[in-house]
Design a protein with these regions (language model features):
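Regulatory hinge/linker segments at domain boundaries
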Residues: 120-149, 154
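Hydrophobic "lid"/C-terminal helical patch
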Residues: 117, 146, 189
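Recognition helix of helix-turn-helix DNA-binding domains
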Residues: 151-191
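Conserved catalytic core of two-component sensor histidine kinases
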Residues: 107, 114, 136, 143, ...
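C-terminal edge and immediately downstream basic/flexible tail or linker adjoining helix-turn-helix-like DNA-binding
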Residues: 194-199
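N-terminal regulatory/sensing modules of transcriptional regulators
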Residues: 1-126
Length: 199
């Protein structure tokens, strides 16, 4: 397999590239860290798989997801797989919707990653999972208020609801986001775009 890896974190990208090239199944894994270099390298050779980081903010005005369709326009036979530390359903859903053949968590072991890449090279494609139930406007208000550090009694008073009703809303938020506590729910709500982080 010939793989083109685009990740804006140099230490991670260079290490992963060297690691993958140690596997017999991979003949080359060329690493790039910025978008200009990426398009140049993509155009001069044929690649079996393009492995893209979702978050490319440091080196690109686009996210990895934004690049998927552009890659297929230039190299329709190349398969695009996403690599990310953000294993959020909304990102996974959008990436697969735009044509990515797989969405791989950065926490995967080298062995798991190579197995996934081998499966991709043989035509395997991930299916789009169902998206989480969306938070209601009220639920988004609540999780945002929780992030400010207000007590549950203060939040209930501001929203003119009982504390019992507030707890019901909070439990619904946890269930929808797959969160175990308020901090995890708040961080996931930010990652999914339901609320913006406090500055």
């Amino acid at each position: 397999m010939k793989i083109l890896l685009f990740d804006d974190h140099r230490i991670f990208g260079e290490s992963l590239s060297k690691l993958l090239e140690d596997w017999d199944a991979i003949s080359i894994c060329h690493y790039v860290s910025n978008e200009t270099e990426f398009w140049n390298i993509l155009s001069v050779d044929e690649w079996d798989i393009v492995l893209l980081d979702v978050n490319l903010r440091d080196q690109s005005k686009n996210s990895g997801i934004d690049l998927i369709e552009k890659i297929y326009n230039k190299k329709p036979k190349t398969k695009v797989a996403m690599l990310s530390s953000y294993d959020m359903p909304v990102y996974r859903q959008e990436a697969l919707k735009r044509g990515a053949v797989s969405y791989i968590d950065k926490s995967a072991s080298a062995d798991e990653l190579v197995k996934k890449l081998t499966a991709i090279s043989k035509g395997h494609k991930s299916t789009t999972p169902p998206l989480l139930d969306p938070l209601t406007y009220r639920e988004a208000e609540i999780i945002k208020a929780i992030g400010t550090g207000k007590t549950k009694h203060e939040i209930a008073q501001e929203l003119y609801i009982s504390v019992r009703t507030l707890y019901n809303h909070i439990q619904s938020i946890y269930d929808k986001l797959g969160a175990k506590n308020a901090i995890e729910a708040y961080n996931k709500a930010i990652a999914l775009g339901y609320i913006t982080p406090l500055i």
